[in-house]
Every structure is written in structure tokens, then in C-alpha cells.
């Protein structure tokens, strides 16, 4: 009986942990500064926000994500912590295909966040994506 009760408690705990993770696939966004990077998905949980990126650039050339990159939500900045498949401020050399995938890790966003901006900063050539929708709503366009 104790084993069954212990198993039920573990399953309930795992379900609770899993429920706190939110995944937004191919989020809509309002504007971007470059077509060289695209967000494939964003995973939000209580320990981190992980942004999955596909980069497109000329083969055997490089792109770089600045170490001061951040997400901004409701006026607050969440600076990049690390990366998977990339390191902030280090060149990412593009393979022959011209496509490279990586992840950027940021602090957790508040649970009620509906939109977020990504930017490297305000300098020439910086990557920025504004109005990334975490709520499943379509992008806003003044042209629509």
C-alpha cells in the first residue's frame, strides 16, 4: 500500500512540474530587423525561458549573438544567460547548408507574459524581433 501511495505522489509531482512548462511553437511577431534568424519555438517554465532559433546566412560566413542580448517584457529586461549550440559574442560559422540551429537561455518570464521583444541592442546590424506573441494570437500589422 505504501508503494502505491508513493508512486501516486511521484506521478502527481511529475504532472505538476510538467504543467508549469509552456511551449509556443512558431510564435507570431510584429516586426523584425533581419530575416537571418527565425524563432522556431519558445519554452517557458519557472527556471528559464529557452528560445529556439534557426539562423540562415551565407555558407562559410558567420553571425554572432551579442552578450548583451535580452528579452524585454512589460518594460523589464531579461539578459541572456547562456546558449546551446552557440556562445554569446562568439562567431557562429554557417555550414554549407547556410542553416544553423541553436538555443538561447534567458531567465524565466512572468507567467502572465503575453508578448516579448528580443534584441541584441541598439547598434547597426543588431538582430531584433519585436512583439513576439506568447499567447497564440496573430501578429499585429498596420497593413492588415
Protein language model annotation of sequence segments:
Residues 1-22:
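Bacterial Sec-dependent N-terminal signal peptides
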Residues 21-46, 75-78, 82-86, 143-144:
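Low-complexity, acidic Ser/Thr/Pro/Gly-rich terminal tails and inter-domain linkers that flank the onset
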Residues 43, 54, 93, 103-107, ...:
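Generic structural detector for well-ordered beta-strands
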Residues 48-58:
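Short, well-ordered beta-strand segments enriched in hydrophobic/aromatic residues
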Residues 49, 67, 100-102, 114, ...:
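Envelope-exposed proteins and targeting segments
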Residues 56-95:
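The feature marks short-to-medium sequence segments in extracytoplasmic or secretory-pathway proteins
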Residues 79-123:
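Short, solvent-exposed, Trp/other aromatic-anchored flexible loops in extracytoplasmic proteins
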Residues 128-144:
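Pro/Ala/Gly-rich low-complexity, hydrophilic intrinsically disordered segments
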Amino acid at each position: 500500500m505504501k508503494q502505491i501511495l508513493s508512486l501516486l505522489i511521484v506521478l502527481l509531482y511529475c504532472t505538476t512540474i510538467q504543467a508549469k512548462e509552456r511551449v509556443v511553437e512558431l510564435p507570431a511577431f510584429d516586426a523584425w530587423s533581419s530575416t537571418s534568424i527565425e524563432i522556431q519555438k519558445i519554452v517557458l517554465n519557472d527556471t528559464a525561458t529557452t528560445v529556439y532559433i534557426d539562423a540562415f546566412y551565407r555558407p562559410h560566413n558567420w553571425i554572432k549573438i551579442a552578450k548583451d542580448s535580452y528579452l524585454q517584457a512589460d518594460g523589464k529586461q531579461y539578459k541572456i544567460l547562456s546558449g546551446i549550440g552557440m556562445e554569446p559574442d562568439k562567431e557562429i560559422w554557417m555550414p554549407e547548408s547556410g542553416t544553423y540551429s541553436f538555443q538561447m537561455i534567458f531567465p524565466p518570464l512572468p507567467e502572465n507574459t503575453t508578448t516579448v521583444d528580443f534584441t541584441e541592442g541598439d547598434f547597426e546590424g543588431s538582430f531584433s524581433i519585436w512583439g513576439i506573441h506568447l499567447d497564440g494570437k496573430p501578429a499585429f500589422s498596420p497593413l492588415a
